[in-house]
Amino acid sequence: MAIIDDARKGIITDEMKKISLIEKISPEKVRKRIVEGKIMLIRNEKYPSKKIVAIGKGLTTKVNINIGTSSEVVNLDMELEKVKIANKWGDTLMDLSTGGDLDLIRREIIKHSELPVGTVPVYQVFIESFKHKSGGAYFTEDDLLNTIEKHLKDGVAFMTIHAGLTKDLAIRALKSNRIIPIVSRGGDMIAGWMIHNNSENPYRKNWDYILEMFKQYDAVISLGDALRPGATGDAHDEFQIGELLETARLVKSALEKGVQVMVEGPGHVPLNEIAWDVKLMKKLTGGVPYYVLGPLPIDVGAPYDHIASAIGAAIASASGADLLCYLTPAEHLSLPTVEQVEEGAIAYRIAAHAGDIVKLGKKVRNWDDVVSYYRGKLEWEKMISSLIDPERAMKVYTQFGKPKVRACTMCGGYCPMMWAMEQVRKISD
C-alpha cells in the first residue's frame, strides 16, 4: 500500500518509525506531514534501497549526487566508482546517462547503489528515437510511458517529470530575450517534441496514467523545472514563475491521488533572491519538499561552481529547501571525474549542515558543539574523529609531521587555547 494511504488511515508504518528515530522527530508528526505532502519517503516500494531516505519539513537537508555517462564519455567502471562516492556522502543518486547501453548502465547503478536512485526518463526515449528514427522528437507518447514503466520495474525510486512546461510557455521562452532560453536538457527535449509534433506536453496529456504508474510502485514524482534560469539575469522571470504556477496545480492533483511528489527548483539565482524563492515555492505548493540545483548565485565561477553553489545551497537549506542537488568543479565545463564528484559531494554535505543549523537548531548544532569542545581542549584525536571528513583532516593535521607541542603546526607554542588553559589554572588556584 502507498505510504500516503497508510498515513491517511492513521497507520504508523515501520518506515515512519525508522524515519522518526533517524530524524529525532515524533512518529505522529512524520505520519501527519506525509498526509499533508510535507514529508515524503523516497523509495520504490517493490525495490527498496538499503538506506531509508525521507525529506521534508522538520527533517535534515539531504544531498543528491548526479552521475552518468555522456555521448562523449562512456565508462561504466568510472560511473560505478562514482556510486561508491555517492554511497559515502550522499542521500539520493541520479543516473543522468545519455551514452552507451542505457538499460545496462541504469541497472548496474541501481545494483551497486545503497541510495534511492532517480532518473530522467525523457533522456532515454529521446536518445533512442534519435538512434532508431533519425530524430529525437519522433518518439510517441506510448514510447515515453513505456520507458517510465521500464524504469519503475527496474527499481527507480524517483523521476524528473517535466509536466509543468506547456507548449505556449516553451514557445514564448524560446522567442524571448532571455539570456539563455532553456538550459534544462530534459525540458528542451520536451519543448522540441511539442514543437515538432505541434502537440501539448505528453506528460500533461497522460498525467492521470502517469500518476497510476507511480502509485503502483509508490515511487516519487519530481516535477522538473524546464524553464529554470540558467543565468542569474533570468531568475524569477515570467517563464520560471509561469511554469511554477503550472507545477503547483500538478502537485495538488498528485497528492489527491496519493502519489508522493516534490518540486525541482533553480538553478542560477542571485543571493538576495534565494530565500524568497524557497518561500514562494512553499507557498504556492502547500509546502511539499523542494529539490534545488544549487542554487548558483554567480555565473562566472567555473571551475569552482561547487564552491559558489554551496553558498547558495546553504541559504536555500536554511530557508526551507529539503534536497540539494550538488554541483561539481566540472559544472558547465565537462563530465566530472570521480575526484570531482567527491569534491562536489563534500561541499554540499557542508552546505546542508550549515543550513540545518539555522533550520533545525540545537539538535544538529550539538555536533558542532562537541567538535568545538574538543578543539578548545586540544584533544586532537577526538576532535578529528568527530569532523565531517576525519581521514582527510588527519592527513592535513600531520602534513608537516606530528606537532612538537600540544598545539598544531599553525600556532605551535603560541596557541591561544593552550595558553588559555594554563591561564584558567592560574586564576583558579
From Swiss-Prot:
Its cofactor is [4Fe-4S] cluster. Gene3D superfamilies: Radical SAM ThiC family, central domain (3.20.20.540). Pathway: Cofactor biosynthesis; thiamine diphosphate biosynthesis. The keyword Repeat does not apply. It catalyses: 5-amino-1-(5-phospho-beta-D-ribosyl)imidazole + S-adenosyl-L-methionine = 4-amino-2-methyl-5-(phosphooxymethyl)pyrimidine + CO + 5'-deoxyadenosine + formate + L-methionine + 3 H(+). [4Fe-4S] cluster binds at residues 408, 411, 415. Binds 1 [4Fe-4S] cluster per subunit. The cluster is coordinated with 3 cysteines and an exchangeable S-adenosyl-L-methionine. GO terms for molecular function: 4 iron, 4 sulfur cluster binding; carbon-carbon lyase activity; zinc ion binding. Disulfide bonds: none annotated. Keywords: 4Fe-4S, Iron, Iron-sulfur, Lyase, Metal-binding, S-adenosyl-L-methionine, Thiamine biosynthesis, Zinc. Its EC number is 4.1.99.17. Substrate binds at residues 66, 94, 123, 162, 184-186, 225-228, 264, 291. It comes from the Archaea. Belongs to the ThiC family. Catalyzes the synthesis of the hydroxymethylpyrimidine phosphate (HMP-P) moiety of thiamine from aminoimidazole ribotide (AIR) in a radical S-adenosyl-L-methionine (SAM)-dependent reaction. This is Phosphomethylpyrimidine synthase.
